[in-house]
């Protein structure tokens, strides 16, 4: 059933159709090649906005640093990062005055979390800069490597597994004269292949020890690696994002925990909530402003955009904020929280892979690593790159650029939101002391500002005052990209408000379709996405029914599983026809086995296997749900799995779907080619790590899984657990005396 899309819009009001103008269908753009240029752009831009600050030199690393704090007050509308400390502190004080006790309560909550968080919190998150290998790794591997190096250098605070103890190690490591690390390297040899008698290149992986002096270690500890942000829609240019290393991560986590706790208590904050909860919160603020603007008042809303939010934020400002927020707290707590902003004031940006050169005539390609940019002759580069390199050269040390001002993308989202809200908070009449007043919403760098005043002049004055107040704390509202409307129509974090939030359905478009995990998961995810959009995004019954039919069609084409009685010929059709003919109850066949589709919009919540179970032939049931079926490598499947779906905006979301284990829930095997590369050692580490975790989970199944308290190691915890379980099983008669004795014997040998 193919549909002419224009039919969908015949009776649609204009505001509901606005979402179709978004660049959301089709594949998003991905970046290829090196991110070095984008990173240099970021570094140069950041320095440009703060160029009138003071230059100093870091005594430990020798890095030149620019400090724009308390710099000149702006005289024009250009973006600038000259935040004034006293203004930031005053904004914090007013925020506390409006919300008595907010900072103290959040500090108490955070203090409790700080004392309880385990170091494995850092295994969450994707790519992390691994300072031991000087490149990105999965978070768990990077953490394991860091702890291993710490241990071999005599730092053992992290044995008990608390994050705070690991951070003590980090602090101590920075005072050490030198650190010894193990790095991987590749050897290439030309050897003759016995079978083919041809020459082949053989690679072997070596590990070697390397000593880093204090300066080199500090540079690595303060380094943020950079990557290009992928899949960004609606932009012509790509941009760089940062992946910090393990030394910085833990400290940032605690600062963000405190800031999150504050944001939860602020009605103007769009973080940390999301979805329908966020919409309700925002609608409240709008309602408040509209009810308060009596017949005599005008109310206008600015859909705001800030110029270069990250480049103009400053870690030194965050330090001032934290110092103020924690001023009544114990010394140790204040110290732990102030380290993240201090590290960020001394951060180094790693320039990535460097540049690739190719000579067409000689068919040669060569990579110029970032480390060489400081000394290479610039005649090889084009004009724009040459300018970039010239600008950045004074800042380069060992292939990293000193970047003191500015925050890289996504590092302190919560804390910067607190700063933004503190300016919105100043709009109350009791603070403005004039006829105009404002309120609004803030979510990281996105904001909406609602201004009320008796006349247009008042609105203009209110906006001007807001604009100038923001400038004082390093926030630059863009006059070109912000626009103003009568209150009732605005956009905030891609939610469109028109007397209530309009469902922006096109945001969800990319998550429709076949995910490509396996036949079982794809069917389940597909129908769950449709179900969720009927609940949350005004997907109407007729459109949902159409989406479902398109999905089934897409699914059949993807897995070549057209109905058994179809005329379409594919590689699978011969087998599927045979199955169709020998099946008595054809309605019981899964769609992926050439069966009919029994889904409609009423039964989307039921997994397909359950939907058809009663209709299946017995021998088909036996084949489909047989754990001993030799053709299937099984994962142990929980009743609920998580899929990663890509909405068009923001990060990939995790979505739950029902998982029923059948012979269709296969897991593809890993690509073998990784085994011949330098990643092999890492892969083995990762598998080792995985095995240990799985073993641990076996002893502490999630229902009873309370992490072992105290200082026992994983092994001790598992042994004591095994003893308890064995005793219970023995006393209840589930195991024999001999078995019990054997278990006890094994336990004591392990100890």
UniProtKB/Swiss-Prot annotation:
Residue ranges, annotated region (Promoter-binding site): 249-256
A cellular-component GO term for this protein: host cell nucleus
Region (Disordered): 54-82
Cellular compartments annotated: Host nucleus; Host cytoplasm
Keywords, ordered alphabetically: Eukaryotic host gene expression shutoff by virus, Eukaryotic host transcription shutoff by virus, Host cytoplasm, Host gene expression shutoff by virus, Host nucleus, Host-virus interaction, Inhibition of host RNA polymerase II by virus, Nucleotide-binding, Nucleotidyltransferase, Phosphoprotein, RNA-directed RNA polymerase, Transferase, Viral RNA replication, Viral transcription
Domain RdRp catalytic: 286-483
Organism: Influenza A virus (strain A/Duck/Hong Kong/2986.1/2000 H5N1 genotype C)
Catalyses which reaction(s): RNA(n) + a ribonucleoside 5'-triphosphate = RNA(n+1) + diphosphate
Cited function: RNA-dependent RNA polymerase which is responsible for replication and transcription of virus RNA segments. The transcription of viral mRNAs occurs by a unique mechanism called cap-snatching. 5' methylated caps of cellular mRNAs are cleaved after 10-13 nucleotides by PA. In turn, these short capped RNAs are used as primers by PB1 for transcription of viral mRNAs. During virus replication, PB1 initiates RNA synthesis and copy vRNA into complementary RNA (cRNA) which in turn serves as a template for the production of more vRNAs.
Protein family according to the UniProt entry: Belongs to the influenza viruses polymerase PB1 family.
Motif (Nuclear localization signal): 187-195, 203-216
Protein name (record): RNA-directed RNA polymerase catalytic subunit
PTM note: Phosphorylated by host PRKCA.
EC class name: transferase
InterPro entries in UniProt: RNA-dir_pol_NSvirus, RNA_pol_PB1_influenza
Superkingdom per UniProt: Viruses
Subunit structure: Influenza RNA polymerase is composed of three subunits: PB1, PB2 and PA. Interacts (via N-terminus) with PA (via C-terminus). Interacts (via C-terminus) with PB2 (via N-terminus); this interaction is essential for transcription initiation.
Principal subcellular localization: host cell
Lineage: Viruses, Riboviria, Orthornavirae, Negarnaviricota, Polyploviricotina
A GO molecular function held by the record: RNA binding
Annotated EC: 2.7.7.48
HAMAP family: INFV_RDRP
Any one biological process term the GO annotation gives: viral transcription
Polar residues bias: start-end ranges: 54-64
């Amino acid at each position: 059933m193919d549909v002419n899309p224009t039919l969908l819009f015949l009776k649609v009001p204009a505001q509901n159709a606005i979402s179709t103008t978004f660049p959301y269908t089709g594949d998003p753009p991905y970046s290829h090649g090196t991110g070095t240029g984008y990173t240099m752009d970021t570094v140069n831009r950041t320095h440009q906005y703060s160029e009138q600050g003071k230059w100093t030199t870091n005594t430990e690393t020798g890095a030149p640093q620019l400090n724009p704090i308390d710099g000149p007050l702006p005289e024009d509308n250009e973006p600038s990062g000259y935040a004034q400390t006293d203004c930031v502190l005053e904004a914090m004080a007013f925020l506390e005055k409006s919300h008595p006790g907010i900072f103290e309560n959040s500090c108490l909550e955070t203090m409790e979390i700080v004392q309880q968080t385990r170091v494995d919190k850092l295994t969450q998150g994707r790519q992390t800069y691994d300072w031991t290998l000087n490149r990105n790794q999965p978070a768990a591997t990077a953490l394991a490597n860091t702890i291993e190096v710490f241990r071999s250098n005599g730092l053992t605070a992290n044995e008990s597994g608390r994050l705070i103890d690991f951070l003590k190690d980090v602090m101590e490591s920075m005072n050490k004269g030198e650190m010894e690390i193990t790095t991987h390297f590749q050897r290439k040899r030309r050897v003759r292949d016995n079978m083919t008698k041809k020459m082949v290149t053989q690679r072997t992986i070596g590990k070697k020890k390397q000593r880093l002096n204090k300066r080199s270690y500090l540079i690595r500890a303060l380094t943020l690696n950079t990557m290009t942000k992928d899949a960004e829609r609606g932009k012509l240019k790509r941009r760089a994002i940062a992946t910090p290393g393990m030394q910085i991560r833990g400290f940032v986590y605690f600062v963000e925990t405190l800031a999150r706790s504050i944001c939860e208590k602020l009605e103007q904050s769009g973080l940390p909530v999301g979805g329908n909860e966020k919409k309700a919160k925002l609608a409240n603020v709008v309602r408040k402003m509209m009810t308060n603007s009596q017949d005599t008042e005008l109310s206008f809303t600015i859909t705001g955009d800030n110029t270069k939010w990250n480049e103009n934020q400053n870690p030194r400002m965050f330090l001032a904020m934290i110092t103020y927020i924690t001023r009544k707290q114990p010394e140790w707590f204040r110290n732990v929280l102030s380290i993240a902003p201090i590290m960020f004031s001394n951060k180094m940006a790693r320039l990535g892979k460097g540049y690739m050169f190719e000579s067409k005539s000689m068919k040669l390609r060569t990579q110029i690593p970032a480390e060489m940019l400081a000394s290479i002759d610039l005649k090889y580069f084009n004009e724009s790159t040459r300018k970039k390199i010239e600008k950045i050269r004074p800042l380069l040390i060992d292939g990293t650029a000193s970047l003191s001002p500015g925050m890289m993308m996504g590092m302190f989202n919560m804390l910067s939101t607190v700063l933004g809200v503190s300016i919105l908070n100043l709009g109350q009449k009791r603070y403005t002391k004039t006829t105009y007043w404002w309120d609004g919403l803030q979510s990281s760098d996105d904001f909406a500002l609602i201004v009320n005043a008796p006349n247009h002049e008042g609105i203009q004055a209110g906006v001007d005052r807001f604009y100038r107040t923001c400038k004082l704390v390093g926030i630059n509202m863009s006059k070109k990209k912000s626009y103003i409307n009568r209150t009732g129509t605005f956009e905030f974090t891609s939610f469109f408000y028109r007397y209530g939030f309009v469902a922006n359905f096109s945001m969800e478009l990319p998550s429709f379709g076949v995910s490509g995990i396996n036949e079982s998961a794809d069917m389940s995810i597909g129908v769950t996405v449709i179900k969720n959009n009927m609940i949350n995004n005004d997907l109407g019954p007729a459109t949902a029914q159409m989406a479902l039919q398109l999905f089934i069609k897409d699914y059949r084409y993807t897995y070549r599983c057209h109905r058994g009685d179809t005329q379409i010929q594919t590689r699978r059709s011969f087998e599927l026809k045979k199955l169709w003919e020998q099946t008595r109850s054809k309605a019981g066949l899964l769609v992926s086995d050439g069966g009919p589709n029994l889904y409609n919009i009423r039964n989307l919540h039921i997994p397909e296997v359950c939907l058809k179970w009663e209709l299946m032939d017995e021998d088909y049931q036996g084949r489909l749900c047989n754990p001993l079926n030799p053709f299937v490598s099984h994962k142990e499947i929980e009743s609920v799995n998580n899929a990663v779906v890509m909405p068009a905006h923001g990060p990939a979301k995790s979505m739950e779907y029902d998982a029923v284990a059948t012979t269709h829930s296969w897991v593809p095997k890993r690509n073998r080619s990784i085994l011949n590369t330098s990643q092999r050692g890492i892969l083995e580490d990762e598998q080792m790590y995985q095995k240990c975790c799985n073993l641990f989970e076996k002893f502490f199944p999630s229902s009873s899984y309370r992490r072992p308290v105290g200082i026992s190691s994983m092994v001790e915890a598992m042994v004591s657990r095994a003893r308890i379980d064995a005793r219970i099983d023995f006393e209840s008669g589930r195991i024999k005396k001999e078995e019990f004795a054997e278990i006890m014997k094994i336990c004591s040998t392990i100890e």
